[in-house]
């Protein structure tokens, strides 16, 4: 990426820019001796009732909230319409309203916000579907840059883009970013494999290497000013992998195990990131957090064998820290499948899981998936409360967990 300075046309003009190519930039992961405790639940917070949601999140002593920042593909997306000036967050095609709102609520609540850049707008991939990557990864890099400018902590939104009922002036900073979600799962990134000659290429890792590079470059290209340099404490996490994969390209629903995915992404040019992220869910409700997968499931990465993944991250990229950006146990009731555990066991497993994570010096964050159960039984019932708001024992355990 060439050096350039972009001036954003807006009332209360603020300076943002593109630094030297991230291929030569030096960003090192923060080393942390503590564990940030947080929540991943966008339905509850992003497009739910934010006033009530953040009152609850504060009462739970939440330190970090993760939500998706949709580039395209949903009604909540920022860029369903193609911008004329994609690196400018003030471009009128962009719709940041939901994200401005949640950024202000999080800031006012003393909660750090994490944005996961996700899904491709149809104009960027020829209408191939939101889980398919863009034809040009420059488009993704430009969007990541625009988002990082807007939430740099130094940006005043143009009057036409600002909801003045939530306040005016500089938008709050967001310094935690993740690139996509579970790219080793075809629900989130497709295709997982393509045939190249007589072999199968892990296409999800090939494309993800470029997704990671684009988001990393875009976020880290933002300057407060040429003199003051980059936004302080900005971190981009890559990986964000799900715990399992069948490694079966000929099946109707192929996926990639997280170790194979990391190795392939490195091979295909995933250059750098500040933190790695992973979702080390158990395979069943009767597996405690310390359970180590064996046999045919040995390449599944859960909390009990998380050091296997950390060792691979170290081998390829050095001793980067790990963010656990999703974790949880579903409860029975209401989930009567193999994934459900009792309300009492969920609370016990939560305490055990956070103790395991806290004892690992390279795990610096752990986010529980859901405040409330999802209403559809085919969804997730790992909430601290039921869909009607009845608190499970895990509610009080989460409140009392040690915070970093």
Feature roles, as predicted:
Residues 1-9:
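Bacterial N-terminal signal peptides that target proteins for export
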Residues 22-25:
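Boundary at the C-terminal end of the N-terminal hydrophobic targeting segment
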Residues 32-37, 60-67, 107-114, 172-176, ...:
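Loop/turn elements at helix/coil->beta-strand transitions in domains of secreted/extracellular proteins
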Residues 9-18:
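Bacterial N-terminal signal peptides
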Residues 132, 173-178, 183, 188, ...:
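Aromatic-rich peripheral "rim/lid" segments of glycoside hydrolase catalytic domains that contact
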Residues 47-51, 141, 145-175, 196, ...:
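Noncatalytic carbohydrate-binding groove/subsite architecture in carbohydrate-active enzymes
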Residues 27-179, 184-203, 241-243, 252-253, ...:
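N-terminal substrate-binding region of glycoside hydrolase catalytic domains
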């Amino acid at each position: 990426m060439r050096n350039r300075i972009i001036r954003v046309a807006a009332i209360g003009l603020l300076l943002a820019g593109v630094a030297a190519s991230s291929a030569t930039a030096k960003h090192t992961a923060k080393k942390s001796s503590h564990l940030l405790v947080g929540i991943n639940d966008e339905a509850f917070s992003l497009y739910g009732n934010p006033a009530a949601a953040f009152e609850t999140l504060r009462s739970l002593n939440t330190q970090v909230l993760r939500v998706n920042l949709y580039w395209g593909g949903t009604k909540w997306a920022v860029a369903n319409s193609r911008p004329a000036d994609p690196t400018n967050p003030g471009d009128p095609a962009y719709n940041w309203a939901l994200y401005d709102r949640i950024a202000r609520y999080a800031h006012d609540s003393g909660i750090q916000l994490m944005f996961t850049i996700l899904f491709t707008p149809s104009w960027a991939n020829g209408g191939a579907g939101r889980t398919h990557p863009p034809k040009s990864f420059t488009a993704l890099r430009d969007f990541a840059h625009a988002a990082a400018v807007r939430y740099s902590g130094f940006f005043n939104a143009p009057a036409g883009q600002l909801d003045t009922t939530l306040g005016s002036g500089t938008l709050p900073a967001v310094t935690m970013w993740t690139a996509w979600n579970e790219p080793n799962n075809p629900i989130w990134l497709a295709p997982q494999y393509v045939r190249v000659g007589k072999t199968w290429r892990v296409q999800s890792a090939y494309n993800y290497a470029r997704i990671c590079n684009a988001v990393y470059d875009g976020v880290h290209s933002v300057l407060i000013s040429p003199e003051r340099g980059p936004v302080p404490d900005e971190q981009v996490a890559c990986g964000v992998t799900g715990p399992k994969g069948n490694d079966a390209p000929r099946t109707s629903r192929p996926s990639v195990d997280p170790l194979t995915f990391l190795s392939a992404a490195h091979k295909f040019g995933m250059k750098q990131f500040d933190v790695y992220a992973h979702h080390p869910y158990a395979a069943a409700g009767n597996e405690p957090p310390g359970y180590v997968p064996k046999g045919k499931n040995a390449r599944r990465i859960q909390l009990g064998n998380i050091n296997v993944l950390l060792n691979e991250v170290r081998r390829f990229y050095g001793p980067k820290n790990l963010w656990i950006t999703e974790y949880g146990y579903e409860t029975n009731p209401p989930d009567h499948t193999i994934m459900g555990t009792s309300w009492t066991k969920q609370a016990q497993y939560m305490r055990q899981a956070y103790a395991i994570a806290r004892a690992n010096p390279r795990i610096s964050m752990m986010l529980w998936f859901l405040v409330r159960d999802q209403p559809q039984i085919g969804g997730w019932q790992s909430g601290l409360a039921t869909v009607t708001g009845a608190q499970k024992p895990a509610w009080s355990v989460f409140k009392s967990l040690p915070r970093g």
